[in-house]
Structure formats: C-alpha cells, structure tokens
C-alpha cells in the first residue's frame, strides 16, 4: 500500500513538473500508516520519528498511542479559519493557517532565517519571508541561513530597488493570489507534506513558488 502511494506521488510530481517537491517528502522523518476500512488496528509508539501521521477512513476503530519523541502534533485546520498551533518545547516553529485577506504594507521588514530570531511564523511574516528570499539579489549562501549548501538567489522577476517584488499592481495581485493558493495547499489542504520543518525545506519551497510565479507573470506581460 505504501509502495503504491509512493508510485502515485512521484507520478504526480512528474505531471506537475515540480521536481523540487520531492525534497519535502524525501529526507522528512515521518511515519505514514494506511488503515483499511472496517478494521481494528493498534499502532505502537514510534521512537525515531518526529511525528506519526495516520490516515484513518470512516468506520474504523483505531487506537493510536502517543509517540515518544514527537516534536509536534499536526491538526486539521478547517477552511476560512485562522488558527495558531503553538510549538512544543522541542519545535522551532509554529504552523499557522494563512487567511485569505493577506495584506502587504510599505513598512517591509527583511526576514531572517536565523533560528534565534523567532521561534514561530505568523501568516504575514511567512508571506514576507518567501518574498524576501525570492527578492534576494546578493551572493548569499545557505550558510548565511544556518545551512551548508550554496544556492543561487532567484531574482528572475523581482526588482532590487523596491520592497515589492513587482511594481505593477495587476501582477502584484496575481502574485499575492498565487502565494495564498500554494501556501494553503502545502499548509492546510495537504497534511502529507511536513512543510517548514526546517529552513532548507522553506527555501526549496520558495524556489518552487518562484518557478510558478515566473510562468504566471510571463503569461500576463
């Protein structure tokens, strides 16, 4: 069952032409357990997984014991709801539902991925964080972000002389809408991807967004 799911997943990735999304799955420590209908199953605690993810269909009687080294629990967040999930003592971030009314002000603040800067992402700082990453025109490496591998800043459609990625209002609205849709998919609609578990995954997601936005902006020029 798990093998079939992985085959489907990589076919989905290939169809969507977002190869980088595999980084959100490979290298993530989680346990996925498929439970068939009308069964009674006991899941023993995991010792090396960061959390346990279980798909539970209807008409199923299941007992799930707590994980011994869980960093956090993932909670389903309904639509049109802004909910903060407080991080546990061993977690370095909080997952926050992103509302539909994300606004951007002129008092733009550069986002730092230093883990000591903040232990949580709010919707607006998360939104600004990706924009700041994509708008980076310097020669920084991932070492500057507490990481080890070098990377090339993605600056295809962004201006270095302004805090806004693009000055045109129409394009700016398209970009904001795309951010909301993509982030909602990763954070709310699809709990199979443990996003923002670390900052390397965060930067990879930013690169995915940049690719999507480049296509959208080119089509609307």
Curated annotation (Swiss-Prot):
UniProtKB keywords: Late protein, Repeat
Start-end of each Sequence repeat: 28-48, 49-69, 70-90, 91-112
Keyword Oxidoreductase tagged: no
Keyword hit for Metal-binding: no
Regions annotated as coiled coil: none
Inducers of expression: Expressed in the late phase of the viral replicative cycle.
Bilayer-crossing regions: none
Family: Belongs to the asfivirus I196L family.
Name of the protein in question: Late protein I196L
Organism: African swine fever virus (isolate Tick/Malawi/Lil 20-1/1983) (ASFV)
Lineage, top ranks: Viruses, Varidnaviria, Bamfordvirae, Nucleocytoviricota, Pokkesviricetes
